[in-house]
Amino acid sequence: MDYIAEPATDMSHTSDWPLPADSLRLPIPAALLEKLAVHPLSRDLYPTSLGHYRRARDHRMSRERHDEHLLIYCSEGQGLLRVREGEAWREYRVGSGDLLWLPPGMAHDYAADDRQPWTIFWTHLRGDSATWLQHSAGYRDTPLRHWGLQHALLGGFEQLLEVRHSGYRFQHFLLAASRLRSLLCQLPLLRPLREGSLDLDGLHAYMREHLHARLELERLAAFCNLSKFHFVSRYKAITGRTPIQHFLHLKIEYACQLLDSSDQSVARVGQAVGYDDSYYFSRLFSKVMGLSPSAYRQRVRQGEGGA
C-alpha cells in the first residue's frame, strides 16, 4: 500500500474523499457547535463531525496537527494507521472489529487497504471529559484496541448517525452528544471478543443493515473473520439454522413490514430486500410464509393477521 498520498492537513479537518451514494459525511455547523460547547448537558463531550464510509477504496488522510479526538471503528475490510511517537512513526494494521482513538496532538496518517478497503464509522469529538474516557477505555498507551464486532458498538454508532435526519435542530444534536457519552462509557464494560469468536448480535446487526443487498456466505464469514466452514459450523451449533437461512428470514420479515405498512407493489418490496426478479422473490416469500406476498397483504388487510 502506498501510504501517504496527500499533503498533511492542519488541525482536525475531515478528508475530502469523494463520497459515494451509500456513504455519509456529516460536519456539524459552527452555530450548533457553539451551543453544544456551552450547554450543561454537552459542553464536556460532544461530536463535531461524524460519518460512515462503506468499502472506502482510496480513502486516506494525513494530519500533522490535530486538535480534536477522533474515533474510527472498522466493521469490515482492512486499513493501515501510522502515528508519530517522538521522532519515529509506529505502524498498526487495522482490521474488522478494531476501534481507533486518536487524541489531540497525535500526528497520524491512515488509509484503506487497496485490496480490502475498510468500512468505518467515525466521529470527531471535543470536551473536557474525552481524555478521561479515553484512558478509562484502555487507550492511554495505544491508539488501537480490538473489541470485535459488537452490537453495542455497531448499534451505538448507528444511533449517532440518526442525527442526519434532524434538519439541524439543536435538540437532536444534544441527544447525539448524550448517545456519544453512552457509547464511550460502555467501553470499559465490554469484553473484547477473542479472535475467531462469534458475536451474534453484531452479525445480526450487520445483516439488518444489508437487507437491501445480496450477502454471500463468503462475505458473512469474512465479517466474522472465520473460514466459511467454521463460520457455518459455529453459527448452526448456536442457532440451529444456517446464517443464510437467518438472513433470508430477516429479509422476509422486513418484506412483511413493507407489505403491511405501505402500498408499494410486490416488485418494489422485492427490490427493497435485494431481489430484482419479482417472481423469484414471490417464490422465496411463499416458501417461508406459506402464501404469496399478494395473498399475505390481502389477508392482513382483511384483519386476519393482526393483533
UniProtKB/Swiss-Prot annotation:
According to its UniProt entry, the protein's GO biological process terms are: positive regulation of amino acid biosynthetic process
Q: Where is the HTH araC/xylS-type domain?
A: 201-299
Summarize which parts of the chain are annotated to bind DNA, as ranges.
218-239, 266-289
One annotated GO molecular function is: sequence-specific DNA binding
The protein's UniProt keywords, in alphabetical order, are:
Activator, DNA-binding, Transcription, Transcription regulation
- Does the keyword section mention Glycoprotein? no
On whether Mitochondrion is a keyword of this UniProt record, the answer is no
One Pfam family cited in the UniProt record for this chain: HTH_18
Per its UniProt record, what InterPro entries does this chain match? AraC-bd (IPR003313), Homeodomain-like_sf (IPR009057), HTH-like (IPR037923), HTH_AraC (IPR018060), HTH_AraC-typ_CS (IPR018062), Tscrpt_reg_AraC-type_HTH (IPR020449)
- Classification via PANTHER family: ARAC-FAMILY TRANSCRIPTIONAL REGULATOR, MMSAB OPERON REGULATORY PROTEIN
Function noted in UniProt: Regulatory protein for the mmsAB operon. Activates the transcription of the mmsAB genes.
Report the protein name in the record: MmsAB operon regulatory protein
